[in-house]
Amino acid sequence: MRILIVRLSAMGDVIHALPALTDLRRALPDAHITMAVDERFADIVRLHSGVDRVMAIALKRWKGQPTAMQTWREIKAALHALRQQRYDLALDLHGLNKSAALIWLARAGLKIGPHPSLCGEWLASKACERHGLPEQAHLPVPRMRGLLALALKQELGGPADFGLRHAWQGAASKDVVLLHGTSAAHKLWPESHWIETGCFLIAQGLRPVLAWGSAAEHERAVRLAQAMGPQAVVAPPCSILQWAEQLARCRLVIGVDTGLTHLAAASAVPCIALFVGTSARLFTPQEPRWARSLDGGGQSPAAEQVHTAAQELLAMS
């Protein structure tokens, strides 16, 4: 059986789709599974042992260079890769026009997508022949797992398993990765809280490692590290695969609602997730006992709350 799964972005949502892939592999161990994903997050899917083929789609880059010949060559190659084989099932886990376009173009015997009420764009529901409205549809992991269960007509229960290859091995490490950056300003935690937390960690004999992924985040990381003192370091530039390895080797992760925080939680790394402008209900760690989510209810969680949670997790590890 050949199955196409489409979940293009964003990073956290691609991570939240991984338990559905684990469910699919367990339900159909002999199936050939292809996943279409934004090229920026393709390496996340490659970390999952249950995917046979990753189809990297460069939509954002193509959109930025619409008249370039290279763009059109890549689009042609992507369409060929999509249509070169026939699928028994194509499943849209995204529910937007861009994912629906891939489902519509795919040569699949059955095309299933989210219920129209779950689709972010009106046309997105028109590409599929059947639609699913799973229970807990407002939460990403249960929604995508539930949609798969409805597609397979099977009960797929149990705890979410992200199926990532990197196992945590940082119990002896002194590094605590601080994920302060996010693409949405309403998710940011105050810099004063980061500085206070960095100083707290240093007092515990630990080393704050400040991650970054853009020029603005690098400037903030340098600024925070300087305020914390010489023990704090700014991380070098890293790919997603390099971050997956680094997170697996650190003692603890503290991060806002951003992709790498969800990657750490999905990898069973001890993790504190800070939810400022979003809901902690979105947080689904692989090992709940090694994770804490602090929801400020639209406000910033206090630094003291983070310190208490850090002490709890450090004592356990």
Model region roles, listed by residue range:
Residues M1-S317:
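Catalytic machinery of carbohydrate-active enzymes
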